[in-house]
Amino acid sequence: MASLRKTHPLLKIVNDALIDLPAPANISVWWNFGSLLGLCLLTQILTGLFLAMHYTSDIATAFSSVAHICRDVNYGWLIRNFHANGASFFFICLYLHIGRGLYYGSYLYKETWNVGVVLFLLVMMTAFVGYVLPWGQMSFWGATVITNLLSAVPYVGDILVQWIWGGFSVDNATLTRFFAFHFLFPFIIAAMTILHFLFLHETGSNNPAGLNSDADKVSFHPYFSYKDLLGFVVMLLALSTLSLFSPNLLGDPDNFIPANPLVTPPHIKPEWYFLFAYAILRSIPNKLGGVLALLSSILILMLVPILHTSKQRGLTFRPLTQILFWVLVADVAILTWIGGMPVEHPFIIVGQVASVLYFALFLVIMPTTGWMENKALKWN
């Protein structure tokens, strides 16, 4: 008789996705980040739920409610540190996951990839509205600067900004709705993750060789379930270490000052994981142009499958494009650094060069190199 996990309508879905799933035998540690992102999402939802039990979304009490969580709630300080640093780990895993997809040509599963880009945008939106909630100086001014960008939209810009603010400035209505959005989005992300999963399981996983692996599959459990478990332990250990020993390392000291609309912080900047996009935004001396560049810096990922020119899938056997991939990684690192620097010489020009290179790599240099490699191999 077949076991219950293979016959029960609900358990059968779990079985086909996590137990008897045929997975390529040669997938490396770079394939761990999908499950790590799932763990991050679960951690964020759980810690966020406990924080929401004690938080008040009112400008008079928001800042002190966060202080109350850290001082008076049992292990509130730990929950808050896990939640704040969990966001950083979420983005670390996200960038590594996207980097893996770019390196090994996983983007050729177009539906999975595009749902992934939408997920990326949703996570960014969630992190942005979440950063506003403690109602510190950087929360307030970050919200003011970023929401103000919508005023660059022709004709309806100003109306749009006031509609999002719920008034004529970032105020109580803004904080309340941002809290509502921050609570809602993770559940939308969870639903989209299931969709991401669904599309992935239509095709099966890619692998480091970029070849069809139907002839060489192993079951997900126990092989990759234990491999993922090791990743969980490593990530939770790193997150715990950061949260317990240096919880404010990645935060901004200005956010320990309650929001004051009359005093602007000397340098308004977002959290580290948005700095590369912020640098691209700032490198264009035009409001609408900057906003379009900011959007394009993320949405360009959707063009990657269309711009794939090589006859090979991944970069495993393509040394020229490999170099360009690492140039892209270095370029994003430079943009991240520039995003945290003041707008002055030489940072302005470095940011502009790095921004041009970022788009050039995706749109021109990598597709051309892929085509050249085909020519060199006489695969035209």
Swiss-Prot record:
UniProt-annotated binding residues for heme b b566: H97, H196
UniProt-listed CDD domains: cytochrome_b_C, Cytochrome_b_N
InterPro entries tied to this protein: Cyt_b/b6_C, Cyt_b/b6_C_sf, Cyt_b/b6_N, Cytb/b6-like_sf, Cytochrome_b, Cytochrome_b_C_euk/bac, Cytochrome_b_N_euk/bac, Di-haem_cyt_TM
Spans through the membrane: 33-53, 77-98, 113-133, 178-198, 226-246, 288-308, 320-340, 347-367
Predominant location: mitochondrion
Disulfide bonds: none
Localization annotation: Mitochondrion inner membrane
Residues reported in the UniProt entry to bind heme b b562: H83, H182
Positions contributing to a ubiquinone binding: H201
Membrane topology summary: Multi-pass membrane protein
Free-text remark on how the cofactor is bound: Binds 2 heme b groups non-covalently.
More about this protein: Heme 1 (or BL or b562) is low-potential and absorbs at about 562 nm, and heme 2 (or BH or b566) is high-potential and absorbs at about 566 nm.
Function as written in the Swiss-Prot or TrEMBL entry: Component of the ubiquinol-cytochrome c reductase complex (complex III or cytochrome b-c1 complex) that is part of the mitochondrial respiratory chain. The b-c1 complex mediates electron transfer from ubiquinol to cytochrome c. Contributes to the generation of a proton gradient across the mitochondrial membrane that is then used for ATP synthesis.
Protein name: Cytochrome b
Species name: Zeus faber (John Dory)
